[in-house]
Amino acid sequence: MEKTTRFGIEIEMTGITRKDAALAAQTVLGGELLYGGSYYDTYELKTFDGRKWKFTYDGSIRCETKRNGIRETATRLYSVELVSPILTYEEDIEKVQEVIRALRKAGAFTNSSCGIHIHLDGAEHTPRSIRNFVNIIYARNDLFYKALGIEAQRARYCKRMDEHLVTTMNRAKPTTFAKIESIWYEGYRGSREAHYHESRYHFFYGEQVLM
């Protein structure tokens, strides 16, 4: 990734509550802590540069806490997904690392239900480069899975690159993003605009590139 490439990151964790996670991040980032409520019980940290860091509920996380150093089941308050604002590697990676260290110090940890999502800016991509990227991911499916140690119970949230998608895209050789989008969503039900659209649960998810 180029140091100037814009990206966003979502990090799932447990061990502490969403409020405590937001407070831990505030020790690094500063800013104003707001409670957004809603079903996702979101806490929002608005920093002095105007960006917003969110700490929200995710139903896929197995909630745990520690008592006397022993992990035990916890309530949904201990489901924490950190959603970053738009970042760049050059300006923000050290700050992200500081936030993670602060969260760990506050008691956050992960288990096998936790994952990480990285969203890359697709502004400089072309339809051809997207197709090339899809083929690279498909050709190295097994290598990526082995390197990342993706466990069977997490596979439903991190599916391999679909062979039918790759075959269709290579046959059609789409020249516009609209055509790529049609191929990407082919066979799925429901609105494409849905936040938790079924197509997002893959090792590579194309929506952020297409937007």
List where the protein language model places each region.
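C-terminal accessory/tail domains of diverse enzymes
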Residues: M1-F109, E124-M211
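Short, conserved phosphate-binding/catalytic loop or strand-edge motifs used
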Residues: S112-I116, L120
